[in-house]
Swiss-Prot record:
Taxonomic source organism: Chlamydia abortus (strain DSM 27085 / S26/3) (Chlamydophila abortus)
Similarity comment: Belongs to the PlsX family.
Swiss-Prot/TrEMBL keywords: Cytoplasm, Lipid biosynthesis, Lipid metabolism, Phospholipid biosynthesis, Phospholipid metabolism, Transferase
Role summary: Catalyzes the reversible formation of acyl-phosphate (acyl-PO(4)) from acyl-[acyl-carrier-protein] (acyl-ACP). This enzyme utilizes acyl-ACP as fatty acyl donor, but not acyl-CoA.
Protein's recorded name: Phosphate acyltransferase
NCBIfam families per UniProt: plsX, PRK13846.1
Gene Ontology MF term list: phosphate:acyl-[acyl carrier protein] acyltransferase activity
Stretches assigned to coiled coil: none
Subunit structure of this chain's protein: Homodimer. Probably interacts with PlsY.
GO CC terms of this entry: cytoplasm
Reaction catalysis annotation: a fatty acyl-[ACP] + phosphate = an acyl phosphate + holo-[ACP]
Length: 316
């Protein structure tokens, strides 16, 4: 299967040349596979820097943009930058010139532009950011982790459907379960929206819904899919990442390699903008080389798994 991956080099916390070098590392690691190719999107200046210094002159292809989106740009200003590197990448995705787009840039801008350019699944009201996190039993899927600050119960139900479909695509469990991230396990816990969502999930999924789950229990692997609003989910995710980084720094070499590998969230691809008919991956703006490497490599695997088509099929 031929796979064409697009990557926006602009707008992240790292230099575009750092992202480019990671892209070259991925190419080198898959040198024997001629069915994988990349298209990068960058400013004219960055393209010139790449062409003047890279040993891969002209390959991967670099598409020059008139502008790029910064972390300070609002969604509205991002829309106005019609020739930004991010917008060009999404245009290529819309026109099937690439199979997936990866960005380390402005999350709100990426989601807004994606919604304006890429069709959503017919039954989904809002996209959600979906990530995988390590657990004692493998990995769990959690969504939303930042696309929507507030959502209603019907939208949370849509997140649960997409999360279950995604988990089934991974092939590590035949009958995935779902839980609702909340401040307690009891049914009455949380806001009115949480209580309504609890009842809706129970009515819809019955035995597959295991009730509320507290943040500390996510890593036990007691549920396969964790549903959350984007505000709570984002705080959970960044806290978890911070704890891992803290432990890695404090314990250093004392942390056994197999334990470190089990805790390491960077082995998984970045956040998938779930709900779109095409694959868009958001890597953390501060992502290190390894995290970016795995985000790019993971996107190749998701394309080959036809994850968007399979989620759509499950929602039909």
């Amino acid at each position: 299967m031929n796979v064409q991956i697009g990557i926006d080099l602009m707008g992240g916390d790292h230099s575009p040349l750092v992202i480019w070098e990671v892209l070259i590392d991925v190419l080198n690691s898959r040198a024997s596979n001629s069915h994988i190719s990349f298209t990068a999107f960058a400013s004219h200046e960055v393209k010139e820097q790449i062409l003047s210094h890279s040993t891969y002159k002209g390959y991967p292809e670099v598409i020059a943009s008139e502008s790029f989106i910064t972390m300070e740009d609002s969604p509205l200003s991002a829309i106005r930058k019609k020739s930004s590197s991010m917008a060009l990448g999404l245009d290529y995705l819309k026109e099937d010139k690439i199979d997936a787009l990866i960005s380390t840039g402005n999350t709100a801008a990426l989601i807004t532009l994606s919604r304006t350019k890429i069709p959503m699944f017919p039954t989904v009201r809002r996209p959600a950011l979906l990530v995988r996190v390590p657990t004692m039993r493998g990995c769990a899927v959690i969504l939303d982790v930042g696309a929507n600050v507030s959502v209603n119960p019907e939208e949370m139900l849509g997140f649960a459907r997409m999360g279950l479909a995604y988990k089934q695509c991974l092939g590590d469990t035949e009958h995935p379960t779902v839980g609702l991230l909340n401040i307690g396990s009891e049914e009455r816990k949380g806001t009115e929206a949480h209580r309504l969502t609890f009842r809706l999930l129970r009515e819809t999924f019955q035995h597959a819904f295991l009730g509320n789950i507290e943040s500390g229990d996510v890593f036990s692997g007691s549920v396969d899919v964790v549903v959350s609003d984007g505000f709570t989910g984002n705080i959970f995710l960044k806290t978890a990442e911070g704890v891992f980084d803290f432990l890695s720094h404090i314990l250093g070499d004392k942390l056994e390699s197999d334990v470190k590998r089990q805790l390491d969230y960077t082995i998984y691809p970045g956040s998938m903008v779930c709900g779109l008919s095409k694959l868009v991956i958001k890597c953390h703006g501060k992502a290190c080389g390894r995290s970016l490497f795995n985000g790019i490599s993971g996107s190749i695997d998701l394309v080959r798994a036809r994850v968007c088509e399979r989620i759509l099929s499950s929602l039909s």
